[in-house]
């Protein structure tokens, strides 16, 4: 996903977020299958097992990867995700979000709030300034805002 995306759109043209991580440890209780093995092992007594690998526990419909990019690079991002989904088991879907980047605001709301100077950048997210807090800290003419309908 990253190599295809970086090759066509450039390395600074997208932001990839991996939403699931492999924290679940898979273990194996090795059993001997040779002659005299019954004298060496204890069966299921103390069968905790040794770590064999790790995996991610994923629910049906859970988001695995998220990519944000500019509208001009959207086709490159979709192609990269299409190639990447073959590396995952089962059937995967590519869904184009109606939100702005990784924020919780829709595109139209984000652009409206940005033109009103009500959006404050907060890392990869954005905060919406509401009508709470000290009046002295507000901009002139911005003391009382209409309620936000999310």
UniProtKB/Swiss-Prot annotation:
Q: Which GO terms describe its biological process?
A: translation
For this UniProt record, the keywords arranged alphabetically read as follows: Ribonucleoprotein, Ribosomal protein
GO CC aspect terms: cytosolic large ribosomal subunit
Please indicate which superkingdom the organism of origin belongs to.
Eukaryota
Does the keyword section mention Transit peptide?
Answer: no
Q: Which InterPro entries match?
A: Ribosomal_uL16 (IPR047873), Ribosomal_uL16_CS_euk_arc (IPR018255), Ribosomal_uL16_dom (IPR016180), Ribosomal_uL16_euk_arch (IPR001197), Ribosomal_uL16_sf (IPR036920)
Report TM segments.
none
Q: Does the keyword Ribosomal protein apply?
A: yes
Q: Which GO terms describe its molecular function?
A: structural constituent of ribosome
Q: Name one Pfam family in it.
A: Ribosomal_L16
Give each disulfide bond as a residue pair: none
What subunit structure does UniProt give? Component of the small ribosomal subunit. Mature ribosomes consist of a small (40S) and a large (60S) subunit. The 40S subunit contains about 33 different proteins and 1 molecule of RNA (18S). The 60S subunit contains about 49 different proteins and 3 molecules of RNA (25S, 5.8S and 5S).
Tell me the protein family, please: Belongs to the universal ribosomal protein uL16 family.
Can you say what this protein is called? Answer: Large ribosomal subunit protein uL16
- What species is given as this protein's source? Nicotiana tabacum (Common tobacco)
Tell me the organism's taxonomic lineage: Eukaryota, Viridiplantae, Streptophyta, Embryophyta, Tracheophyta
Q: Which gene encodes it?
A: RPL10
């Amino acid at each position: 996903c990253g190599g295809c995306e970086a090759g066509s759109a450039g390395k600074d043209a997208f932001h990839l977020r991996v939403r699931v991580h492999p924290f679940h440890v898979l273990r194996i209780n090795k059993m001997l299958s040779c002659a005299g093995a019954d004298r060496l092992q204890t069966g299921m007594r103390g069968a905790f097992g040794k770590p064999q690998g790790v995996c991610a526990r994923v629910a049906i419909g859970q988001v695995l990867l998220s990519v944000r990019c500019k509208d001009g690079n959207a086709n490159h991002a979709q192609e990269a995700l299409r190639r990447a989904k073959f590396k995952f088991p089962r059937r995967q879907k590519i869904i184009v979000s109606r939100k702005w980047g990784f924020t919780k605001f829709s595109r139209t709301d984000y652009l409206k709030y940005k033109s009103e100077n009500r959006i404050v950048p907060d890392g990869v997210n954005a905060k919406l300034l509401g009508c709470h807090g000290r009046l002295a800290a507000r901009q002139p003419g911005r003391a009382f805002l209409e309620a936000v309908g999310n």
